[in-house]
Amino acid sequence: SLLCEMPGGHFITYPKARIQEIDGRDTLTALKANWTPAADDKEWPRFKLWGGLLAENVTQAFAAALLRNAIRQTEDVALHCHDELALEVPTGEAEAAANQLQKVMEQAPEWAPGLPLLAPPSIMKRYGK
C-alpha cells in the first residue's frame, strides 16, 4: 500500500499501489477499496493515481481534519456540511454561540501552527448559504 501521512497523524491509504503499463505508459494505480467487483471478475478493479487526484485527496483530508477538530471542541452541533458547522441554540444565546464558534474554527490546531483560518459566523433561523 501507498501511504500519505497527514500532519494530524492520520494516513491516506492507497491499497496495493503499483506502477503498471497502461496505453504504453507507466502509470501509478491502486485498488478501488470501496468498490465491490462483479462476481465474475478475477481481481479487484484499480484506478489511476495522478498528481491532481493526489493533491485533491490531501487537500480534502486536511480540510476534513480541521472540521473534525472544530466539531470536537463545539457543543450543540446540529449538522455539518463540507466546511460549515451549524449549531442549534436558543435565540438569546445565538450571539455568544456564534462568537465562540468563530473562535474555535479560526484557531489552528497544534499540528498546523500559524495556519491562517477565517470563519465568519452567520446567525439564522433556518440553515442557508
Model regions and ranges:
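Conserved catalytic core of nucleotide polymerization and phosphodiester-bond processing enzymes
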Residues: 1-129
